[in-house]
Amino acid sequence: MTEFLLLLIGTVLVNNFVLVQFLGLCPFMGVSGKLETAIGMSMATTFVLTLASLSSYLVEHYILLPLGIEYLRTLSFILVIAVVVQFTEMVVHKTSPTLYRLLGIFLPLITTNCAVLGVALLNINHDHNFIESVIYGFGAAVGFSLVLILFAAMRERLAVADVPAPFKGASISMITAGLMSLAFLGFTGLVKF
């Protein structure tokens, strides 16, 4: 039980996918303009990452390995992720049409989010079992969500702040992301992973 908690803390804080491993930067910069959109994207990505981790583990261990076709791993994981994203898109469209409109093109772009494929491949590389794969996927999603929501809140405050003209827009966003990354470096050594 303790190792599962350490795995979760490690993926959320110590080895954060956005700020430490630099995966998922496209939605991090693209959706973080408004807090409401960032929260919606976080929920959708959490669902997709967790379900994709679970599904990719099952595909790897019950289809690819028994048939000896491990060389199709990346292609099959992309297919699994596309199916999970389509399922998520249908669920969001039915349950929250407003959120569906707010997310717009970013919802289908979860398919191309490198963090989702990265989690699936890293699960295999780390040789996680089924439960560890789900926890790793969920932890990566929580870490992504935490960073995305914090960054969106900071960007909303920066939009109304008195920022010097040369630093407005993308410049101050990159500086803020760098400072967030430095803050997360403070968690290094918290968990040996």
Swiss-Prot record:
Alphabetized Pfam families for the sequence: Rnf-Nqr (PF02508)
As for membrane topology, the entry says: Multi-pass membrane protein
Report the subcellular localization. Answer: Cell inner membrane
Which residue ranges does UniProt annotate as crossing the membrane?
A: 4-24, 39-59, 63-83, 102-122, 134-154, 171-191
Q: Which UniProt keywords apply?
A: Cell inner membrane, Cell membrane, Electron transport, Membrane, Translocase, Transmembrane, Transmembrane helix, Transport
Its Enzyme Commission number(s) read 7.-.-.-
Stored InterPro entries? Ion_transpt_RnfA/RsxA, NqrDE/RnfAE, NqrDE/RnfAE_oxidrdctase
- Keyword flag Cell membrane: yes
BP terms from Gene Ontology: electron transport chain
**Catalytic EC class:** translocase
- Give the main location: membrane
| Any single Gene Ontology cellular-component annotation | plasma membrane
**What function is annotated for this protein?**
Part of a membrane-bound complex that couples electron transfer with translocation of ions across the membrane.
Q: How does it assemble?
A: The complex is composed of six subunits: RnfA, RnfB, RnfC, RnfD, RnfE and RnfG.
Which family would the database say this protein is a member of? Belongs to the NqrDE/RnfAE family.
For this entry, the protein name equals: Ion-translocating oxidoreductase complex subunit A
Organism placement in taxonomy: Bacteria, Pseudomonadati, Pseudomonadota, Gammaproteobacteria, Alteromonadales
What gene does the UniProt entry assign to this protein?
rnfA
